[in-house]
Amino acid sequence: MLLKEYRICMPLTVDEYKIGQLYMISKHSHEQSDRGEGVEVVQNEPFEDPHHGNGQFTEKRVYLNSKLPSWARAVVPKIFYVTEKAWNYYPYTITEYTCSFLPKFSIHIETKYEDNKGSNDSIFDSEAKDLEREVCFIDIACDEIPERYYKESEDPKHFKSEKTGRGQLREGWRDNHQPIMCSYKLVTVKFEVWGLQTRVEQFVHKVVRDILLIGHRQAFAWVDEWYDMTMDEVREFERATQEATNKKIGVFPPAISISSIALLPSSVRSAPSSAPSTPLSTDAPEFLSIPKDRPRKKSAPETLTLPDPEKKATLNLPGVYTSEKPCRPKSE
């Protein structure tokens, strides 16, 4: 298990980002999807939790075979997807990623949003605080992103919002910018497979970090597109975009219903687990194991002995070996 806490500051308020994150997730998913690969929305419905209150439950399938490194593609099926389940009780959210093909793989993300510059060292509960983890600050203006994802129009150093006047962020902007908020994300990655655990967990964290950086940059760079939206308007945008995304990747499900009014009973949707636990395995998985030596099953003798032709008359065998008719029991 590899645990890291990411802190991503934004030149927004927590109330503003409630709309911004929904808009960004929908648009980003649509842009990153293509025929056969991308994000398929399976469910998006209201959810009620006895502890956290009213929220929104979403389930998605993330098809990403071509985005895997070559060493990973060698051991996964051609049609490969990760299941994402998210419970949004904004400003608190839980997201879990699992894969039926890799039962020992899971990602658990616990997120909290606050109006500060990432200075709260005790934002997560005492149990999480006691776990050894690395705290990583992500700077949307100054941290480098993979070159293939770079767009000058989405670069906070160059972009300036016409509606809010915010933008063109410079190094050190977090120290004096107002307003400012922070996304605190506690990310647990598990891949408890002998021989691959460290490599896979480190790779997944690198991917998670890149996605967080790109997504938060886009949420700010698109602020003029969503800033005046109401919750009903962003939900309608979400519904239309998700249907278009499903068609884009070749999935044609029934129309997606998104509502923030009617609430489903808590028994309808399973609540999120804590970081999904998987038993520690010290043995290599079956598909990586060296075949075991097993004794051969003998369906026939290794040598075949034919009867001596000179003795066949005395063997009392069927006509294949003798011209005599086979013996039959005497009738009483």
From Swiss-Prot:
The keyword Transport applies. Disulfide bonds: none annotated. Keywords: Cytoplasm, Lipid transport, Lipid-binding, Nucleus, Phosphoprotein, Transport. The keyword Secreted does not apply. It comes from the Eukaryota. InterPro entries: PI_transfer, PI_transfer_N, START-like_dom_sf. The modification Phosphoserine is found at residues 119, 122, 270, 274. One of its GO terms (biological process) is signal transduction. One of its GO terms (molecular function) is phosphatidylinositol binding. Pfam families: IP_trans. It catalyses: a 1,2-diacyl-sn-glycero-3-phospho-(1D-myo-inositol)(in) = a 1,2-diacyl-sn-glycero-3-phospho-(1D-myo-inositol)(out); a 1,2-diacyl-sn-glycero-3-phosphate(in) = a 1,2-diacyl-sn-glycero-3-phosphate(out). The modification Phosphothreonine is found at residue 278. Residues 272-332 are annotated as: Disordered. Residues 272-281 have a biased composition (Low complexity). GO terms for cellular component: cytoplasm; nucleus. Belongs to the PtdIns transfer protein family. PI transfer class IIB subfamily. This is Cytoplasmic phosphatidylinositol transfer protein 1. The lineage of its organism: Eukaryota, Metazoa, Chordata, Craniata, Vertebrata. The gene is Pitpnc1.
